[in-house]
Amino acid sequence: MDCHALQSKARNDKNLDSNNNAQKCLESTFENTHAQYDSKRCGGALQALGQFGGGSYLSGNDRPQIAPILSNRSPKTESPQAKTPPVLVSLTSFPARLPYLHHTLYSLLTQDYKDFHIALFLSSSEVRPDELPLILKIFARLGLLSIHFVEENLRAYKKLFYALQAYPEHIIITIDDDQIYAPNTISLLLESYARFPRAIHTNWTYDAAFLAEILDIDPAQYLPIIKENAPHLALASVGVSGVLYPPSPFSQEFFNTHAIVSLAPYSDDLWFFVMSVLNDVPKVLVKNALEHPKESSIAQDESPNLWEINCEQNRNYDQLRALLEAYPQARAKILESLELA
């Protein structure tokens, strides 16, 4: 979550209750294949998940059978994105949040657009495969989730840094691990992509005051570019609400880990922004952009977490200044795009 975007914190207890019910059903089924199926408790929660990919979790009377539902995937969705590249939704997490990650995953599995895969990138220095929560192992066994263990711990960067290398031909949508996403999050991003296929698409941007202060300009000179459905090089995406990246949006400099660690170790959004400017990739605030997603609320944060580091300690200012000093051509491109050069 970013302090420079309007924040709307809210619990989604109804969704969390349904998620917990579905989790209990799935876990009890894998642990005991003779478990009794309580349709009143679990049926509704599992029904939506069973529809994902055209399969079904349940069959028979008293012995629920969980099928690998992606094996015969036939998404029943009419979408203008039918001819787009394959779509990957990518996220990362860390040990304290893993027990609660299924809340975010359920919100993805109930999206109105179905034709995508989910990849989770974890640092092998933080967690081993045998330490994963059972629900994540179930998702992986069902084919709903690919879990990648990487050696280097690049914090929040992992969800895009490694996804771009593992899935170079994919559209990649990044999300956060402690949010519950609206059912139309992915479809809105893809509809925007269909209009502007070279651009990066976002539901949230950094505000004018922040960028203007770093660029040493009047906020009134930056504010006019923050509008929906209007690509602009100088827009800066905020990742929490979901960001879509087209295939191969960055140059090789994007993978410069030395620069990442030394210039912006805690702010992947700002590194992505500067790298997009260097590669002349515009950003688009999607049409009918969604409000800030609901927090899963029970997720455990790092101490200090990235919000505290970047906002309360003003590290966002320090990191963006460092990036623009290291890449003066990015500053020049931004000012030129604002017709201030």
Segments predicted by a language model, with ranges:
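A cross-taxon signal for low-complexity, glycine/charged-rich
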Residues: 5-19, 27-31, 36-45, 49-63, ...
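Short, acidic, metal-binding catalytic loop of nucleotide-sugar glycosyltransferases
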Residues: 106-115
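Conserved catalytic core of nucleotide-sugar-dependent glycosyltransferases
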Residues: 182, 188-257
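A conserved hydrophobic helix/loop-capping motif in glycosyltransferases and polysaccharide synthases
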Residues: 88-96, 111
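Short beta-strand-to-loop acidic/aromatic patch adjacent to the donor-nucleotide binding site
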Residues: 170-178
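C-terminal catalytic/acceptor-binding lobe
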Residues: 30, 259-341
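Active-site-proximal specificity loops/subdomain of glycosyltransferases
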Residues: 124-166
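Cell-envelope/extracellular polymer assembly enzymes that use nucleotide-activated donors
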Residues: 86-88, 117, 271
